[in-house]
Amino acid sequence: MNQKVVFLDVDGTIVNDKGIIPESTKIAIRKAVENGHKLVVCSGRSLFQLPQMLLNLGFSGMVTAAGAQVIADGKEIYHAVIDEEHRKFSVDYMEKNNFVYCFQTDAGVVMNKRSEQQILNIMSDMGITEEHLRQLVGEFFIQEDVWNNEKEEKLIYYDAPFGVARVHADLEPYFDVVALSLSGADDYCGEVGINGIHKATGMKRYLEYVGIPREDSIAIGDGPNDLQMMDYAGIGIAMGNAKEEVKKRADMVTSHIDEEGLYRALDRLGLLN
């Protein structure tokens, strides 16, 4: 078997909705690595939001912030950030329409005081505790001039007055907007990134760097922001807990994350033999 590169989403694929990595998932990742395959985190999370328990599993690389940063063999090979003009533009839009929002940087999450309290309330309503939220998003930086950070990679919003399609139409062509990939999120929560930068472009940059063809890549995910990743890969796999639209686009559907979903997928592909 050729060496494979397996790109793994984090939330709902590696880490369950309780913030736990199932033991079967840990075993699967370690076995695949021992068998000579490259496993790469491919997440909407920024690098600082990846817990140490995940980093300890032996990943060969990271595609973070939905493609805005790519790390291979321990070094950064790509990093895109939102320019000042569009940081200001997006903040003006969010404030004018009373969105609850924050920016992700490579060091923490930036938000104003108004959004901080409302995000805590929204997460509580979704069944996510403040402790789990801080595991998900990392450190909070509170500042009123939210746009004033040159390391801002993407924007997350909640409780919007209209759906993702409308927000996308309002913010293009510079930005691309997809539904937020988080258990309990609805069409009024989204991820805003630079148009043309997404998980699949991060995969492409990683594969070109390591010299492995696209047909030897596998992508596994569960949310709308995983669709481009799964379409780009040689094989796209949906978790059993994935949204229905994701399952329909997948080449294969495995079981739920808490029912050995990742282990069964990699085993079925022969990566654990």
Model-identified regions with their sequence ranges:
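Anion (oxyanion) recognition and catalysis
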Residues: 33-34, 95, 172, 231, ...
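Conserved acidic, metal-coordinating active-site core of Asp-based
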Residues: 104, 108-220, 224
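Mg2+-dependent phosphoryl-transfer enzymes with acidic/Ser/Thr/Gly-rich catalytic loops
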Residues: 1-5, 22, 189-273
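Asp-based phosphoryl-transfer active-site loop
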Residues: 3-19
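Hydrophobic packing residues within well-ordered alpha-helices of enzyme cores
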Residues: 25, 50-54, 167, 171, ...
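Short, structured coil segments at secondary-structure junctions
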Residues: 57-58, 66, 173-174, 232-233, ...
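Short hydrophobic/aromatic-enriched beta-strand-loop microsegments
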Residues: 59-67, 123, 177-180, 236-241, ...
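Active-site phosphate-binding/coordination module
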Residues: 18-125
